[in-house]
């Protein structure tokens, strides 16, 4: 399996998963969870992925990779997810996928971690449940979740966009559930020992 790396000394790759398919078209699902070990807040400007072969030659590049959150606090986690399709005829030669992170000099929004979130896998879906534990209607809540094997390989990931939820309100003590259909490559590797983890944030713009 191809390895996922990050040359940025501020971030450490903790878990990752690469699901490659070449039955109908050359495509890959790439997931990673990185830890901010810099001791500083990191406002994310953009994330790129570079696919390399065993000798380090670039086979393909994705310039705008999905991620969550938009600002990573010290010791916080950064979720990264990308679907690459028709990206190379050399899919069998892929040895590594390198993540490059560009940051801003200052943050223009704050991503506050929320309690009351959990994730689970049931059948063909990854579910995320968020309960508003505050006394006010909660707007701008964004969730992310991973489905992993017992040894930490990420099989699938759900990432929400703040644009999708900024005007959605969750009443106090109320619960909302989202779901994502698992990719085919993930369902083939499902076992009784899979583990789900969830994150939730409230986005506030300065």
Predicted features by range, described:
Residues 1-27, 31, 97-125:
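Low-complexity, acidic Ser/Thr/Pro/Gly-rich terminal tails and inter-domain linkers that flank the onset
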Residues 22, 34-39, 53, 130-134:
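Asparagine-centered strand-capping/turn motif at beta-strand->loop junctions
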Residues 50-62, 147-159:
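Short aromatic-acidic-glycine turn motif
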Residues 59-89, 157-186:
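Intrinsically disordered, low-complexity Pro/Gly/Ser/Thr-rich segments with frequent PxxP/GP/PP motifs
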Residues 28-30, 45, 78, 124-126, ...:
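Hydrophobic core residues within well-ordered beta-strands of beta-rich domains
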Residues 32, 42, 47-51, 138, ...:
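Short, structured motif recognition centered on aromatic/hydrophobic residues
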Residues 83-125, 181-206:
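Terminal connector regions
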Residues 39-44, 58-60, 137-140, 154-156:
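Short acidic/proline- and small/hydrophobic-mixed sequence motifs that coincide with surface turns
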């Amino acid at each position: 399996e191809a390895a996922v790396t990050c040359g940025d000394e501020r971030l450490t790759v903790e878990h990752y998963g690469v699901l490659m398919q070449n039955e109908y078209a050359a495509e890959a699902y790439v997931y990673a969870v990185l830890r901010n070990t810099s001791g500083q807040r990191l406002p994310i400007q953009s994330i790129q992925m570079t696919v390399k072969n065993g000798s380090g030659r670039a086979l393909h590049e994705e310039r705008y990779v999905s991620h969550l959150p938009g600002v990573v606090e010290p010791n916080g986690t950064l979720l990264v997810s990308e679907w690459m399709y028709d990206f190379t005829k050399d899919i069998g030669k892929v040895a590594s996928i390198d993540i490059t992170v560009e940051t801003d000099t200052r943050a223009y929004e704050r991503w506050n971690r929320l309690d009351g979130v959990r994730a689970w896998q049931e059948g063909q879906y990854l579910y995320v449940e968020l309960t508003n534990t505050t006394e006010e209607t909660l707007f701008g809540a964004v969730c992310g979740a991973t489905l992993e094997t017992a040894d930490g390989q990420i099989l699938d990931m759900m990432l929400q966009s703040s644009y999708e939820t900024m005007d959605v309100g969750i009443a106090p003590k109320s619960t909302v559930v989202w779901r994502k259909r698992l990719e085919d490559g993930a369902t083939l590797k499902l076992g009784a020992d899979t583990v789900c983890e969830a994150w939730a944030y409230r986005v506030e713009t300065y």
